[in-house]
Amino acid sequence: MKKIILVAGGTGGHFFPAVALGEELIKRGYEVHFITDLRCKQYIKQDMKVIFHILDLKRSGNIFLFLPRLSIAVLKAIKLLYNMKPSVTVGFGGYPVIAPMFAAIFLRVPIIIHEQNSYLGKVNKFFASFAKKIAISYEKIKNLPEFAKSKIVVTGGVVRENIRELKVIEMSSRGLTTGSKKSLIKALDSVVKPRNDKLFTIFIFGGSQGAKLFSELIPASIQFLMQKQPSLELNIIQQAALDDQVKIKDIYSKLNITYEFAEFFDNMALQYKEADLVISRAGASTIEELTYIGLPAIFIPLPSAADNHQYYNAQLLEDEKTGWCLEQNNISAGKLADKILELISNPKILEDASQNLLKRRKEGHKLLSNLIEEVI
């Protein structure tokens, strides 16, 4: 049985798509090993079928500290890969892939890199010259070296199986035009106030890195929104830290808004199925999932994201009329409230955005697996 190594870490945005790819490759008869770091250890579940290996590389702004750490990590990775003898190594970008990719190059194992964002990251750009193929999610990608263009294959991003099973969530099946929808939200770690099925549902989350900003901005925006339109019936599903939930709960209760809180949503499919609109960061895996199911979003890019890639992701979607980009440095509770009210008041805008999203949907798990099989 041929072995394939996947390398991803740092955030859930890198981790979960790689796991989804691994599960597709296992179905095709490959033995899949996954090298990740300590940050992503928390996401490993017993029912995941790939074989995990933890290889941590701590970041440091001091080159004299980082180089010895990198050297040790590369030696460990060489030993790991030498014993496995993989047919190919696939890297998803970010600093956790550096050591395993160097090891693969040293052992002459073919490498493929996958860029999930619309801006080629520094690590992927560095390894582009060594890669057999470069898989990308967006047809328009920034920061791509001229020499790398011949290696490009547009595969789209890889979406988790439980999200793919949702297929297309038609706008008419949400709260926009029908009141028959039943709540599927049963998160055990949530704070839930019962809702009826006629409410417009907004799902707010900040990804695996969370979003402290949202715990302050969103409640203030909802207050503005209800002042402008007191008759609105809303349901809010929101990722929030435990110590923020009491304060937010008090605000929403006074506004007679139903709500659900969780520190982290383990099964996003349940929340996606409920939502009429999403407010989130603009990480690649979030965008791919929303694209796959045709769920429109207001994106507030994380300003500290490497190479400002979240801004480029969100701006591209706004240009394609598939979402809306509001920059954190320029946003206010009033501006966000105005945008939400505009979308609630004009369902056709949401419907058009949903259809535009579906036009760019790809079966990334299959296309990337096909590419890997071509290289082996």
Curated annotation (Swiss-Prot):
Similarity section: Belongs to the glycosyltransferase 28 family. MurG subfamily.
Biological process terms in GO annotation: carbohydrate metabolic process; cell division; cell wall organization; lipid glycosylation; peptidoglycan biosynthetic process; regulation of cell shape
Subcellular location: Cell inner membrane
Main location: membrane
Keyword Signal annotated: no
This protein's name: UDP-N-acetylglucosamine--N-acetylmuramyl-(pentapeptide) pyrophosphoryl-undecaprenol N-acetylglucosamine transferase
CDD domains in UniProt: GT28_MurG
GO CC annotation terms, alphabetical: plasma membrane
Entry binding sites for UDP-N-acetyl-alpha-D-glucosamine: T11, G12, G13, N117, R160, S208, Q310
Membrane-spanning segments: none
UniProt EC number: 2.4.1.227
Pathway: Cell wall biogenesis; peptidoglycan biosynthesis
Catalyses which reaction(s): di-trans,octa-cis-undecaprenyl diphospho-N-acetyl-alpha-D-muramoyl-L-alanyl-D-glutamyl-meso-2,6-diaminopimeloyl-D-alanyl-D-alanine + UDP-N-acetyl-alpha-D-glucosamine = di-trans,octa-cis-undecaprenyl diphospho-[N-acetyl-alpha-D-glucosaminyl-(1->4)]-N-acetyl-alpha-D-muramoyl-L-alanyl-D-glutamyl-meso-2,6-diaminopimeloyl-D-alanyl-D-alanine + UDP + H(+)
InterPro entries registered for this protein in UniProt: GlcNAc_MurG, Glyco_trans_28_C, GlycoTrans_28_N, RPE4
Keywords of the record: Cell cycle, Cell division, Cell inner membrane, Cell membrane, Cell shape, Cell wall biogenesis/degradation, Glycosyltransferase, Membrane, Peptidoglycan synthesis, Transferase
Membrane topology per record: Peripheral membrane protein
A Pfam family of this chain: Glyco_transf_28
